[in-house]
């Protein structure tokens, strides 16, 4: 009986299940979008029960599409939107509030208060992260402080916190297992990435009871088995990693200096720095890349909040395109951006600027500016933001990047990939299997149950679908980058501080 690995890929806008074979090829995919909830400007929430329901649904669907039985699944890997925070009652299994999403800015003011107390330095030293509303810690605190009765329940030991991975595993095991992995823990702003444990001082500062927190384990190990009610059989849950770290693993960036960019809702650049946690002087995050083989490996990360989401905005709000795919056609109908720059700082701007008060802007408009120029400027914004992050990474790590591995939905846009290569001045490699996030989780799960022997076996699965080489003159490139940097400065510090 042929065996497979199931990967549950719980993203920001959809829940997916992908089944992989031994060669790392996609056997089947099932996907369901779920509701985005925007209670106030800058606030973003999800319904944890809807996420769990849809995730369980697509798992069954993917098995049906592949025409395989649950007995043929050797292990399940989970990868998830990181930082998104769920707090639930362990007695009832019910969330006390909606999941507060990574993009949500509601705790920016509280982060400013912590910064005024000089705590940003402590947080960076311990967690490798910037003090920002993006991470889970202040979201947990907000729930405890603002949801009626939550603080009392937490003090009594009745509330559990988890990122989406923890929430899924808890439900898959019928509440038996409350666990996360090193990569997800490293995104909470509560985890000491050097000592590899929850940090008592940070928990005290934020007034978060330790009893709420999950046990932290390696990214590749058997956490437990699914309850039989789910598939009719028990299947080992054996891999867990945050989406960006999973993509780094799926892209087989196993050596220091190897990097990938995922062009999803946001863009996320990660560079493996090996067993050394590199402290960033350029506004990047130091994070855990993977916990495997009895050790952890670290990475530098640049987070770009709005990547592919700018294309959704062109489609849904401005109605300039009917589908995301059309953007490539429009962008190539004009010779250049005609001096138009779009800075998509809809929820502030991330690395290496970190300004919560920046807002989106379109600059350089003249009477000759057309729809095509704005669409092109939107695509180009992803490449410029990637350039800024990559330069910061090279400076911090002292490693010059030779090539960039790419994945995520927008990497299928050939115009964008060519422009990315031009602006970076390095080769951009798109792999055969672009589902690298799900693939990374599958690899972690498969290694834990002996489905794959080791990382060498996995590396042989990686293959290039298309390579893009830089073809732009330096002078033109420098001029474009200069224009972009000018545009970014105009977008910063726009929103009034409360």
Curated annotation (Swiss-Prot):
Positions annotated to bind sn-glycerol 3-phosphate: 12, 82-83, 134, 243
Ligand binding (glycerol): 82-83, 134, 243-244
Activity regulation description: Activated by phosphorylation and inhibited by fructose 1,6-bisphosphate (FBP).
EC numbers for this chain: 2.7.1.30
Pathway(s) per entry: Polyol metabolism; glycerol degradation via glycerol kinase pathway; sn-glycerol 3-phosphate from glycerol: step 1/1
Function according to Swiss-Prot or TrEMBL: Key enzyme in the regulation of glycerol uptake and metabolism. Catalyzes the phosphorylation of glycerol to yield sn-glycerol 3-phosphate.
PANTHER family, per the entry: GLYCEROL KINASE, SUGAR KINASE
Protein name: Glycerol kinase
Organism per entry: Clostridium botulinum (strain Langeland / NCTC 10281 / Type F)
